[in-house]
A protein has these predicted regions:
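The alpha/beta-hydrolase serine catalytic core
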Residues: 69-134, 141-149, 161-162, 166-167, ...
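Catalytic nucleophile-loop/oxyanion-hole region of alpha/beta-hydrolase
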Residues: 9-37
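Active-site signature of alpha/beta-hydrolase-fold catalytic machinery across serine-
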Residues: 54-55, 153
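Gly/Ala-rich beta-loop-alpha elbow adjacent to hydrolase catalytic centers
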Residues: 44-48, 52
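C-terminal alpha-helix
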Residues: 187-195
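Conserved alpha/beta-hydrolase
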Residues: 1-10
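Conserved alpha/beta-hydrolase fold motif
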Residues: 39-42, 64
């Protein structure tokens, strides 16, 4: 499932923040524990990758897969990504040019939340040494170079004795979509089913 606000126009997206999304992750983990699962794996792309790391810093996970996770983001970089998301959603919704401009202007009201999000990224990165789970760190060869650098940073900082890193040359930022997806999915399935 999407995090609250994700997949919605910017006007609705900005009603939520990183704390709402993190609460969803915690609820999902708690649900699995209450259902009796003792061996829990986690995987995530981008924001989901960050939350996979954060979860592994705070609870015992068997295996983790982290894809396209940033090790740092400037406020301007976060705002740019939100604007890019907003433009894509506005196209999907077929908003007029005026409606799109009005929608994107609301990103300015989200600056406090952007600062909080930046702080969460910094906090996650400063606690990577707490991660002991078996880990697979992945990045797309068609993504921005910063994500390859982030993958190597994360790989080098986690304390896991059993960790690996790999690029998927055909994949873009959202690695689970588009070209290279099938190979990626096979890799993840094999990783999670290893004994």
């Amino acid at each position: 499932p999407n995090y609250p606000g994700h997949g919605l126009p910017v006007t609705q997206f900005i009603k939520y923040d990183v704390n709402d999304w993190w609460a969803c992750v915690q609820e999902a983990y708690q649900f699995l524990k209450e259902e009796g699962y003792e061996v829990i794996n986690a995987a995530g792309v981008s924001l989901g990758g960050l939350f996979t790391l954060r979860l592994a810093e705070n609870v015992e996970l068997n295996r983790i897969v982290v894809m396209s996770a940033p090790s740092e983001k400037t406020e301007a970089g976060i705002a740019w990504r939100l604007e890019k998301y907003g433009k894509r959603m506005n196209q999907i919704m077929r908003l007029s040019e005026d409606e799109s401009v009005e929608s994107l202007a609301q990103i300015d009201q989200y600056q406090d939340e952007i600062k909080v999000f930046q702080g969460v990224i910094n906090d996650i990165m400063s606690n990577l040494h707490d991660i002991k789970s078996t880990a697979r760190i992945l990045y797309g060869g068609q993504d921005e170079a910063a994500y390859e650098e982030s993958a190597h940073y994360i790989f080098n900082q986690i304390s896991s004795d059993n960790k690996s890193i790999q690029d998927f040359p055909l994949n873009q930022h959202l690695m689970t979509h588009g070209e290279g997806r099938d190979e990626l999915e096979q890799d993840i399935v094999e990783f999670f089913t290893q004994k």
